[in-house]
Amino acid sequence: MKDALQCPSLFKAYEKHFRIGAAVNSFMAFDPAYRALIRRHYNSLTADNQMKPESVLDYAATLAKSDLLHAAVDFTRVDALMYFARDNGIAMRYHTLAWHNQTPRWFFAKNWSTAEDAEPASKETMLARLENYILDVMTHVNEKFPGLVYTWDVVNEAIEPELKAPGLYRAWSPWFKTCGEDFLFAAFRAARKGQAPGQTLCYNDYNAFEPVKRDAIIDLLKKLQTENLVDTMGMQGHYVMDWMNVPLCEEAARAYAALGLKIQVTELDIHCNSDDEAHSRKLAQLYGDYFAMLKKLKEEGIDIEAVTFWGVTDQDSWLTGFRKETSYPLLFDRAKQAKDAYDAVMKAAK
């Protein structure tokens, strides 16, 4: 293994093909070792949590406003990462504007109530709150950091086939329970209003390669396209080494591209529960095959804009907590050393 800071740059290896990004947090932005690694290898950044609604919505300030349609926002965490990206010449993906998760319960409640049994706000109220929130965020970012954000994740994870609800939507989501499908259109309409030149609007989801979910996502994208509301499909890419299927990923990417959409891989990692030699070789093979596939599609004319890893090193991966076992899913290990998977990704670029 080699020190990541002594290795050739990932993003420079792929700069003729697509951006290479990473999900980062505020700690990384202020830690010298992480800062150096990020500057060397990535030309796109995504906030892992700092730009989700729960990190931006300000409850006390919302109550003080006495406006039941307009929540207050606090951009302290957003701005910290935006400054880091701007000062280092790195483009940003904004993740995410509308999501059922990591959005405070009071945002969906009548009178901004925090009570466990709070009455839900009406559909009309929620659609107004959604539009106001999206426009507040986009206006702030685009005015304070012009040209920095190139893509907005407008809606995140609206499809869940296992629920078998109409449209295979995530029916238990407070957005769907209150607003139904209309929330999707409202979110993208608001984002179109707030969009700056050169920015794209993205629908983002996991397991987007799985055929049943893929087809449901395509149905949703086609509906959004009737109003020209979506530009990009975000294929998250949270894979597990034992069942990752690169041909299915390719098939899905081709299907989304056939709609005329740009493609981004937005949250790439491959769960691997051992760092022994056999697992390391298998992880490297999968990463190499995956990037070779993406490069091939790009060379065929499919508009793959960016590939973003969900984390920088194995140390900061969310998967160890989520999977409840140590995960080794990324290209750099806990000591910031390049793994075999890094070598495979670099080889695929040639």
Residue spans for each PLM region:
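Boundary/entry segment of secreted carbohydrate-active catalytic domains
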Residues: 1-44, 48-50
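Aromatic-rich peripheral "rim/lid" segments of glycoside hydrolase catalytic domains that contact
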Residues: 3-10, 57, 126, 140-147, ...
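Surface-exposed amphipathic alpha-helices with a cationic face
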Residues: 6-15, 82-86, 188-196, 225, ...
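Hydrophobic/aromatic residues located in beta-strands of well-ordered beta-sheets
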Residues: 20, 92, 201, 263, ...
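Acidic-and-aromatic substrate-binding clefts and catalytic sites of carbohydrate-active enzymes
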Residues: 23-33, 54-57, 69-76, 159-163, ...
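Short, acidic/polar
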Residues: 26-39, 131-140, 211-224, 287-294
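Substrate-binding cleft and catalytic face of glycoside hydrolase catalytic domains
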Residues: 40, 44-61, 67-202, 206-208, ...
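Aromatic- and acid-rich polysaccharide-binding/catalytic face
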Residues: 42-49, 150, 156, 199-205, ...
